[in-house]
């Protein structure tokens, strides 16, 4: 039996700002319980809904030194969906109405969390063989584990894994301040350890000190060794390539299931989608005030509205995208210029464009169920979960071939009758427009082929089961 402690800054259902929460909250329940005891540790934010906080059981508390301060550490426990979750409590750091704030506050907050998490292990009654860290917020854990805690008998032989969900976010701050906060001596702040370009870099520390480094798709693991995707750490990724691998994320097939989903008006499955799926489209058209027409080609886009997601390409050809025979439904928030751009087109083509500048889990499910195609022209995408949800709901993804999108969407080949979606290679607006028009042509003029693409997409398995098997192999190799 291998004991694994997965440490992250967020996990569903307690707190979620991005895909990391889905991984930390969903993945652990899919491991083989006879061979792996996987538990999760996150901060006990005061913004976690009360319905969860009131069920947490107090375990213990103690004090740790953080630089020149002594800080309280409370430890709470809760079992959820058969998985044990631990929560590190300290209202000074984890108070407030959102999990993250300004970077200078987060730098200290997650230095505290890293040290507190390791300090809590002996009092949990659970000794992990492997500590699985996620993103820069836990980047100091492998550093502290090797340099500060390894002398203790309890900690000897514990291995660490660092998973990178998005290399863009690295936890970078002033070297002198980080020395003060972490209490680590000068020799750790050299260019082969925590220092990068005259600053301290938490993620770099994690990558250097961890026994294994993973990222969330095989293609992204290769891409981050190149300067374009490497975010100034490509040299380090090449140096660590012998321990670097990629494992694609999954989605929770219980949560995202068109057959049982209570958030959508009409349930359907891989057999009945031809007769039932269009009813969701008409219901959404009615709700959003679009022209009601079950045959109209509807494209969905659920995303953070930022450059990374390829929205500059969309902005460049938006007039052509919103042709007479298309409806375009957008959901998300982000950069003001993109929010306003979509609002403008909603006003200009109000019968065929709907801009919903907010985020709602309910609305996202309705969009996945109603649309014919789903657009994801990302500049880079470590894994991406939206295309997996689209495939699950029989909505055909149109993606750029990068990172996880390339690994999970097989491009349609009309000659071989293969493929689960449409893709384009170069980051170019007209190339994207060309592939959208190609998809539209197949939809309108080759409906049987289109339905076969939907059918193949709904048959693919991107549940957490397949990811969990690969993580089990990784854990066994340590």
UniProtKB/Swiss-Prot annotation:
Domain of life: Bacteria
Claim: Glycosyltransferase is one of the keywords in the record: yes
Amino-acid positions noted as binding ADP-alpha-D-glucose in the UniProt annotation, renumbered to this chain: 16
One annotated GO biological process: glycogen biosynthetic process
Pfam family, one: Glycos_transf_1
Catalytic activity: [(1->4)-alpha-D-glucosyl](n) + ADP-alpha-D-glucose = [(1->4)-alpha-D-glucosyl](n+1) + ADP + H(+)
Keyword list, A-Z: Glycogen biosynthesis, Glycosyltransferase, Transferase
Family in the record: Belongs to the glycosyltransferase 1 family. Bacterial/plant glycogen synthase subfamily.
NCBIfam families for the chain: glgA, PRK00654.1-1
Name of the molecule in the record: Glycogen synthase
Lineage: Bacteria, Bacillati, Bacillota, Clostridia, Lachnospirales
């Amino acid at each position: 039996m291998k004991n694994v402690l997965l440490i992250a800054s967020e996990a569903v259902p307690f707190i979620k700002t991005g895909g990391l929460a889905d991984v930390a909250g969903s993945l652990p329940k899919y491991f083989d319980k006879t061979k792996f005891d996987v538990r999760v540790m996150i901060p006990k934010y005061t913004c976690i809904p009360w319905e969860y906080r009131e069920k947490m059981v107090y375990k213990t508390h103690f004090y740790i030194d953080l630089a020149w301060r002594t800080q309280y550490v409370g430890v709470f426990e809760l079992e959820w969906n058969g998985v044990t979750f631990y929560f590190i409590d300290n209202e000074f750091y984890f108070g407030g109405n959102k999990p993250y704030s300004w970077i200078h506050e987060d730098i200290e907050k997650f230095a505290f969390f890293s040290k507190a998490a390791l300090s809590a292990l002996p009092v949990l009654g659970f000794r992990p063989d492997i500590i699985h860290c996620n993103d820069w917020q836990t980047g100091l854990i492998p550093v502290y584990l090797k340099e500060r805690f390894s002398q203790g008998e309890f900690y000897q032989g514990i291995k660490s894994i660092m998973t990178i969900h998005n290399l863009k976010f690295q936890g970078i701050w002033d070297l002198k301040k980080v020395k003060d906060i972490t209490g680590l001596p000068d020799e750790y702040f050299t260019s082969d350890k925590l220092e990068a370009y005259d600053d301290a870099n938490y993620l770099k520390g994690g990558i250097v000190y961890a026994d294994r480094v993973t990222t969330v798709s095989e293609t992204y693991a290769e891409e981050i060794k190149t300067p374009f995707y490497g975010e100034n750490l490509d040299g380090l990724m090449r140096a660590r390539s012998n321990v670097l691998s990629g494992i694609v994320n999954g989605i929770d097939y219980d949560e995202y299931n068109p057959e049982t989903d209570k958030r959508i008006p009409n349930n359907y499955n891989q057999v009945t989608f031809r007769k039932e799926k269009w009813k969701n489209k008409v219901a959404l058209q009615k709700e959003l005030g679009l022209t009601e027409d079950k045959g109209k080609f509807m494209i969905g886009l659920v995303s953070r509205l930022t450059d990374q997601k390829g929205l500059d390409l969309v902005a460049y050809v938006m007039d052509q995208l919103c042709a007479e025979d298309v409806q375009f439904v957008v959901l998300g928030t982000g950069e003001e210029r993109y929010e306003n751009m979509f609002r403008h087109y909603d006003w200009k083509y109000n019968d065929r464009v709907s801009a919903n500048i907010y985020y709602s889990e309910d609305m996202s499910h309705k969009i996945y169920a109603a649309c014919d195609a789903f657009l994801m022209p990302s500049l880079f995408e470590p894994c991406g979960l939206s295309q997996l949800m689209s495939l699950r709901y029989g909505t055909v993804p149109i993606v750029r071939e990068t990172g996880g999108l390339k690994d999970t969407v097989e491009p349609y080949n009309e000659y071989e009758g293969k493929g689960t979606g449409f893709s384009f290679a170069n980051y170019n607006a007209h190339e994207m427009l060309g592939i959208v028009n190609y998809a539209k042509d197949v939809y309108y003029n080759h409906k049987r082929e289109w339905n076969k693409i939907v059918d193949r997409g709904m048959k693919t398995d991107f549940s957490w089961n397949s990811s969990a098997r690969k993580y089990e192999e990784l854990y066994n190799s340590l």
